[in-house]
Amino acid sequence: DMDILKQCQKWHEESKQHKIIDALEAIPAEERTPEMDSELARAYNNLADPHKPTCKEMLKKALALLKPHEEYFEDDYYWNFRMGYSYFYLDQEGRALRYFEKALEVRPGDDDTKEFIERCKKGISLPQFWECFRERTEDWWETFAEMEAELRQMMDEDKDHTRGAELVAQMQ
């Protein structure tokens, strides 16, 4: 496992994200370690070009690889940064912010993380809409649809109505 991760690091330094993706996607998902999924997500994040139609798909793939490992990587700088990065470039600054703040907590003073936090706060207070209203609405509806079952379960389980803040945080 360490050999493949070392090789991925080398490819990353050489900007060979496709090699990382090919190598790690060749390993069945159930055999990949959380670290491998994190490296694969990093490669998808780095390949996501905002000027290409595949951008959102790449970022969503990265999130799908990272999300299952939330408990495992809870206090990991890279995992939190990668989650924030994916959400940020999916124009979900509200969601991105909490991951960048956690990353900064783990690595205080990190300039890249501080820069993203500022950009998130600016995006939240002064949103710049690069897409038309219809596209933004469709994207948010798609995001909501993906999360609806999880949200409904949270509401159903919240018999004493104490998880409101948690529900709101999930939708930011």
Listing of model-derived features with the role each one plays in the protein:
Residues A29-E30, Y72, V106:
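Structural marker of alpha-solenoid helical repeat scaffolds
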Residues Q17, P50-K52, L59, E93, ...:
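TPR-repeat structural position
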Residues M2-A29, N45-T54:
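Alpha-helical segment of the N-proximal tetratricopeptide repeat
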Residues N46-C55, D91-R95, C120-T143:
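Alpha-helical linker/edge segments of TPR/alpha-solenoid repeat scaffolds
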